[in-house]
């Protein structure tokens, strides 16, 4: 079968059971699938096996070592431990701050080629899934490795929707928080609280082997996927002083999320189907991204045997960090500061002179155009056709054009990433900036859960306990406090001044009689 025929055949199958209720305009917005999007039919990596041996000569001792190389081009770090200079040497360690070139797991969930700008879920190009799939189906794909049949998809959607209600106790916790509580803080707290309401699924309470049961695992998966948007919506409504809205069982995943945000309790309300489809595509794009910071945190926590709710809460906490999940908010602030396209040349010069920071460009993995950003950029016009055009989009397009034609940025491989345009779309859809990261976290639950599930089946899974390279004092002996002398004048080596409130000063100024 020719490549184009294979693509058409794949699309025909997808279209038969993935069609959304209304995709008006999207067929013109999303790009046509390119002929190279046929990776779903390729079962082996193009480079073949990389298996062999690595010969290492230790110039310190003159010894020669043979280290096995796997078919995937990896060496076991523990094999380097045998490289030693003598009895007091504990063996060679890998020093890799930030895990720039360390693979703590083997995974079949997500593939990224940052140099070529490729992202695939279970072998499917992200462009193809964004074009034809739905978030709930992509969640199934990530979790179980294959696209579901029509009946499997129906069962999956129904089961997830049946677990969308949140325990009243969790809603009470959300309602007890301040009106100005950050939605991500609310999401972390509520996700962690779910552990308390499901003690039957906690290995610390119900036995370490509980997750060996497929039924138990699957139940936690649908619980979290179902409840995440309900919790997020409750956090959103809390900031407006409004009570939570019960989910609807008659809407799609993304429609239901918008329904809980906007219905004001009107059970007959239905979100705009085109906006719901845009949100669904954004959810697909954010669902998974292999071993990013928060996913690594989820797997790290899960390796201890902790319950999956705590693992996901910890992952969301990592996503809360501004270096991970908060970049799209920084992009909006940057574009607003630039103001108009006429100010871009001065801004570009400021970036080159290290006087200004450019947000939304560059990525830890991608040294090419982020494939997600390409899809999001095309979605912007669809959103603007419904809610009106955001003037900052003109600044964004002009900034991208200026940067990609400037040797300074091209040489450093600084291309737009997923955050560059997503913030503009979210703002156009009426979401406040503090809610952007929540819109990242809700779909990323699918990624966290698929990695959690995979780690449970991996025979190489161990409790994560990294080594360190100790650089401190080798040994010293205890001295009584009166005999100690100040060993350093450095402020970083002593306790600093912690300011106290005026109310505390007033209280301390008083006295109490016995």
Curated annotation (Swiss-Prot):
GO terms for biological process: fatty acid beta-oxidation; tricarboxylic acid cycle. It holds the Pfam family Citrate_synt. It comes from the Eukaryota. PROSITE patterns: CITRATE_SYNTHASE (PS00480). InterPro entries: Citrate_synth-like_lrg_a-sub, Citrate_synth-like_sm_a-sub, Citrate_synthase, Citrate_synthase_AS, Citrate_synthase_sf. GO terms for molecular function: citrate (Si)-synthase activity. Its EC number is 2.3.3.16. It catalyses: oxaloacetate + acetyl-CoA + H2O = citrate + CoA + H(+). Widely expressed. Expressed throughout the shoot. Expressed in flower, silique, stem, cauline leaf, young leaf, mature leaf and senescent leaf. The keyword Transferase applies. It is found in: Peroxisome. GO terms for cellular component: cytosol; peroxisome; plasmodesma; secretory vesicle. Keywords: Peroxisome, Transferase, Transit peptide, Tricarboxylic acid cycle. The active site is at residues 324, 363, 419. Disulfide bonds: none annotated. Pathway: Carbohydrate metabolism; tricarboxylic acid cycle; isocitrate from oxaloacetate: step 1/2. Peroxisomal citrate synthase required for the fatty acid respiration in seedlings, citrate being exported from peroxisomes into mitochondria during respiration of triacylglycerol (TAG). Indeed, complete respiration requires the transfer of carbon in the form of citrate from the peroxisome to the mitochondria. Belongs to the citrate synthase family. PANTHER family: CITRATE SYNTHASE, CITRATE SYNTHASE 1, PEROXISOMAL-RELATED. Citrate synthase is found in nearly all cells capable of oxidative metabolism. This is Citrate synthase 2, peroxisomal. It comes from Arabidopsis thaliana.
